[in-house]
Amino acid sequence: MSIFPAQPSDKKAVEEGAAFMPRFDASGLITAIVTDARDGELLMVAHMNEEALRLTLETGIAHYWSRSRKTLWKKGETSGNLQSVVELRTDCDQDALWLKVHVAGDGPTCHTGRRSCFYRQVVSSGGKVALTMASDHDQ
């Protein structure tokens, strides 16, 4: 049984009410956008299932669901770069989350060792599309 109430058919209650009623997709997941609480930089996009969201709320440490490994994932548990949640928001229809976090340790969030998973820019030129390193990426 879910600790989160089901969404009512009343759209206004979902969009304007005070009840947190996350809407998980058909796979039982909700998208989580993660930014650095200090400077707002986009760090990563991940997914949470109900258990990951519950653990995040209970512990204050971000937990996610790994779609590739099909397992719960406490971000930074291996590297020491745990994500302490400073603020958690939901969007208007409660089907996406925004976590503002402080990253412990030496700071990389991406498994490649970079601060952000968004280190490449999509460039379209002369009918061709390619990836280039973003000018503000971290090594």
From Swiss-Prot:
Keywords: Amino-acid biosynthesis, Cytoplasm, Histidine biosynthesis, Hydrolase, Magnesium, Metal-binding, Zinc. It comes from the Bacteria. One of its GO terms (biological process) is L-histidine biosynthetic process. It holds the Pfam family PRA-CH. Homodimer. Catalyzes the hydrolysis of the adenine ring of phosphoribosyl-AMP. This is Phosphoribosyl-AMP cyclohydrolase. It comes from Brucella abortus (strain S19).
